[in-house]
Amino acid sequence: MNSEICLSCEAIERYIGEEEERVHALRGVSLEIEAGSVHAVVGPSGCGKSSLLYILGLLDLPDAGRVSIDSEPVSHLSDDELAQKRNKSIGFIFQFHFLMEDFTTQENVMIPMRKLGELSDNEMRQRAADLLEGVGLGDKLRRPSRHLSGGEQQRVAIARALANDPRVILADEPTGNLDTANSERAFELLQNLVHERGKALLLATHNPAIAEASDWIHEMKDGRIIASHPGGAQSSTS
């Protein structure tokens, strides 16, 4: 396994709510995600999967513990610094694609690039075209996203997650809104991109087939990681 750690957390604690409704959502969670690897987090609804992804994605702050990207602690950064780190270093994929329906596929992929503001308009258009070509949509650059199938829309979301060449991709039920065939295609595409480009992918899923096809599986219960073991992808290469 590649020993280069892209994303890690140590002893994460998170409480949600107030007083009698206060919930201990994460309890001492520690995790390391290597470059070029796919890690799946599984467990029942309410076990803390989404809370963990929000903290690792710098969308929420832990009450205790530390998050690091490329071995650099980030939990102490200001809101503006966290936003910059998030935009540059982390790509997000969700169960629902959240595309702008009236934007073309190319324009949707360009949105994170515009937010980061490091490329010219021509450079953004070319990068978006290259990414869409990589997910098999190079012939639909100018098609409004509302005219795409569900599987195609999720492929646009995958391309958008790669827009700023992030080190880390976080995916919350990325295939949960797709049928079985499109789920398998979307995951295989994402898995290949991660392995080929040396990204680190952490996904939360209820799909046992996708979890088993990952490199590592982390089982969560009641806010804790109770077990971690190699998935089928890791076993097949060892």
Question: Each predicted region: which residue ranges?
Answer:
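The feature captures the beta-strand-to-loop junction immediately N-terminal to the Walker
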Residues: V42-P44
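Conserved ABC ATPase signature
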Residues: P144-Q154
